[in-house]
Amino acid sequence: MQMGRPTLLPCLLLLLVLSTQACFIRNCPEGGKRDVHMIQPTKPCMNCSFGQCVGPRVCCGAGRCEIGSTEADRCEEENEDPVPCKVLGQHCVLNNPGNVNGNCVDGGIGICCVDDTCAIHRRCD
């Protein structure tokens, strides 16, 4: 069976399209296709009146955490920044479904925080 030129060209184009892993305008990552596997940059979480922000409206330090107080309201600004922040301190694990990897709040106050909650943790003393 012989394939004519009019048939060969569309077949080659179809093969080319199917074999490439294209990144179209609607689904490209911000840094381009090669940026997908890069580690996302982080920065230390901002400071609040007596410690460090560990979540929106959550401020921890000096042996305590405050949630929703006027001192912790400044931490809401962290949500406006597109670069995610990381709580300073050693790694800890919470029993929080879907969000278990956290960090101890700096200062050895015995509190471990993940993105949306904090709890007393013996590893953080």
Swiss-Prot record:
Keywords: Amidation, Disulfide bond, G-protein coupled receptor impairing toxin, Secreted, Signal, Toxin
Subcellular location per the Swiss-Prot or TrEMBL entry: Secreted
SMART domains from the UniProt entry: NH (SM00003)
UniProt note on tissues of expression: Expressed by the venom gland.
Chain positions found as Glycine amide: 31
Propeptide positions: 32-39
InterPro entries per record: Neurhyp_horm, Neurhyp_horm_dom_sf, Neurohypophysial_hormone_CS
Signal peptide (residue range): 1-22
PROSITE patterns: NEUROHYPOPHYS_HORM
Domain notes: The cysteine framework of the conopressin is C-C.
Record's function text: Targets vasopressin-oxytocin related receptors.
Protein name in the entry: Conopressin-conophysin, isoform 1
The species this protein was found in: Conus monile (Necklace cone)
